[in-house]
C-alpha cells in the first residue's frame, strides 16, 4: 500500500474505528496489541518486539547508517467508562471506551509505519512504541 493514497487513508480510518469499537482497559490490551501488530506487519519493520511490559510492542525501522534513535510513543489502553454515542463504530465493550483519544493516537503512530517502510531513515533508527498501561 502506497502512503498518502485513498487506500492508505481508508486503512487508517478502518484501524482507528476498529480500535475505537473494541477498547480494552489497563493490563488487558491483548486484542489491541494484536490488531496493531497485524497492521504493522504489513509494513515490514526490521524488528517487531512483542510483550513489552505486558501487551506493549515496538516496531523498529533501521536507517542506512548508524545514528541517533527517535522513539514515537502512544498508549494502548482505554478507560473504564461506557460510551453513549450512536456512531456506527461506538464501543462494543460494555463499560469501556476510548474516550481518552488513545485510539486516534495509536492510529497516528501506526500510520507512520507505511511512510517509514517506503522511505527508511537515512541514518539512525525510528522506533514506534505502543505502550501498555
Where do the PLM segments sit?
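Acidic/His- and Gly-rich active-site-bordering loop/insert found
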Residues: 2-98, 107-123
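Acidic, glycine-rich active-site loops and adjacent beta-strand->loop/helix elements
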Residues: 76-78, 129-133
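Residues at or immediately flanking beta-strands
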Residues: 125-127
